[in-house]
């Protein structure tokens, strides 16, 4: 066990976070995301909410400052977003510094980004449109 590292972060996830370079992207997905068919390494975090994992990793993870570092999936036309999902994610991401703007992209653009991601973390999150992408920045 390591000090000051949240027990929510598995050894596998900690290794992936350490291996990522600046500009690499990681997806924290809801339980329904088709992660295994996307291609990148898949890490299971069953039973955990995305917001809890975000809060756990953000002290260890520098967000990109040159490109939009936080991306979420936009609602499909005719569908509605639950604003509390983004609020929870913003709150989790702002524990170390102000949360950057969250960019919304359509579902298929998000899938394209997921296929190129360094890894996808499947959580137990059940919120609709509960997927979020983080782009790693340069550690100061």
From Swiss-Prot:
> What organism is this sequence from?
Klebsiella pneumoniae subsp. pneumoniae (strain ATCC 700721 / MGH 78578)
Q: Which residues bind substrate?
A: 30, 107, 129-131
Q: Does the keyword Cytoplasm apply?
A: yes
EC annotation? 5.1.3.29
Quote the function comment for this protein: Involved in the anomeric conversion of L-fucose.
Recorded catalytic reaction(s): these are:
alpha-L-fucose = beta-L-fucose
Q: Where in the cell is it found?
A: Cytoplasm
Name of protein: L-fucose mutarotase
- Give the matching SUPFAM superfamilies: RbsD-like (SSF102546)
Query: A single GO BP annotation from the record?
Result: L-fucose metabolic process
Sorted keywords for this record are: Carbohydrate metabolism, Cytoplasm, Fucose metabolism, Isomerase
Describe which pathway this protein belongs to, using the record's wording.
Answer: Carbohydrate metabolism; L-fucose metabolism
HAMAP family, per the entry: L_fucose_rotase (MF_01662)
Q: Give the matching InterPro entries.
A: L-fucose_mutarotase, RbsD-like_sf, RbsD/FucU_mutarotase, RbsD_FucU
Catalytic positions are 22
A Pfam family matched in the record: RbsD_FucU
Q: Subunit comment for this entry?
A: Homodecamer.
What is its EC class?
isomerase
Q: What is its main location?
A: cytoplasm
């Amino acid at each position: 066990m390591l000090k000051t590292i949240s027990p929510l972060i598995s050894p596998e996830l900690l290794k992936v976070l350490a291996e990522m370079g600046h500009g690499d992207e990681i997806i924290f997905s809801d339980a329904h995301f088709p992660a295994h068919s996307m291609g990148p390494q898949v890490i299971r975090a069953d039973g955990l909410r995305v917001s809890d994992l975000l809060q756990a990793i953000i002290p260890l993870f520098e967000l990109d400052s040159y490109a939009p570092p936080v991306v979420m999936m936009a609602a499909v036309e005719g569908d509605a977003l639950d604003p509390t999902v983004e609020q929870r994610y913003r709150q989790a991401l702002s524990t170390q510094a102000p949360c950057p703007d969250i960019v919304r992209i359509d579902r298929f653009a998000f899938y394209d980004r997921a296929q190129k991601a360094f890894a996808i973390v499947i959580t137990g999150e059940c919120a609709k449109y509960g997927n979020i992408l983080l782009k790693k920045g340069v550690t100061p």
